[in-house]
Amino acid sequence: MRPIRILAQPDDSTCGPTALHAVYAAFGLDLPLEQVIDEVHFLEDGGTLAVFLGIHALKEGFNVRIHTYNLRVFDPSWDGLPMEQLRRKLLAQTKFKTSKKLHSTCLAYSKFIKEGGEVRFDDPSPALLQSYFDRDLPVLTGLSATYLYKSKREYSGSMGESIYDDLRGKPMG
């Protein structure tokens, strides 16, 4: 398997771009971490999405496939649709749903597909992961830091600091 060296992420919201930077380096693309962080789109409330990382990778000339299990954005009946039809579904959905984050995510996936990205709905399995590892391809996966570190959910205090609170907090990272 291709060795991947990942730098320490500069702050709590840059794990995605930091991981993407490591993948770039493993494939010989030498970009400063700060540049990747500056160029990847971030959500208003911090952090990024796989699709924003994918758009950046497409712009850098990579082939990008996202396996999604996000039922807030994708309906299971969309599995197997041609990419252009999936793109139209994402855009049509924005007319019926009011969430600003969902709207932004749908538009980003539409752009991702238009720029040549592929969205798949394959069931997560060891065999799926192994199919990438057998081809010496890295896999980036989104995982909440709250889950990863088994920490309490958190919210931001008046000074922007993280306050851990299992009742009032939200998953972070």
Protein language model features and the residues they cover:
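Short secondary-structure transition/capping segments
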Residues: 76-83, 153-154
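Active-site nucleophile-adjacent alpha helix/oxyanion-hole segment immediately C-terminal to the catalytic cysteine
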Residues: 1-74, 82, 101, 107-110
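Active-site-adjacent substructure of cysteine-protease-like catalytic cores
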Residues: 39, 86-94, 99-173
